[in-house]
Amino acid sequence: MYIKSVENLYKKYNGKTLADDIYAVSREYNNFQNAFNRMAKDIAANINAEVVKTLKGHYYGSMFFKRGNRYVYVHYGNSINRTHIDFGNNTWSSFIYCRTAKSDSDYTGGTNNFVTLNELADKIDKLLG
């Protein structure tokens, strides 16, 4: 499905390596995290769901989507090079993965689904049933 904010985030950040302030999240990466969270809210609105919890970690982030009584956990971040953004990879080293969850505190739920940014909305929608 097409969502303008997904396209905008992709164009702005894909392939970029953001500033790394080592001991603290850089302002540039924090701006990226904020943009990712805004995009997630747009995805939720497009699939009749809501973002019920977000976490901004040290060069990674996560969130929970909810529709009815079903939850999906989404994690983003690069485990190999923490400040490099690669939205096009959907393998085990993917920047984004999602899975079913039992609640908005279930960080170990179902099987990881590695997705590209462009696949994310459809995968969340499918996992929410």
Feature-to-residue mapping (PLM):
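Negatively charged, low-complexity tracts enriched in Asp/Glu with abundant Ser/Thr
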Residues: 2-69, 104
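Short intrinsically disordered terminal tails
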Residues: 1-2, 126-129
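Generic structural signal of hydrophobic/aromatic residues within well-ordered alpha-helices
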Residues: 6-9, 120, 124
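Intrinsically disordered, low-complexity regulatory segments enriched in Ser/Thr/Pro
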Residues: 55-122
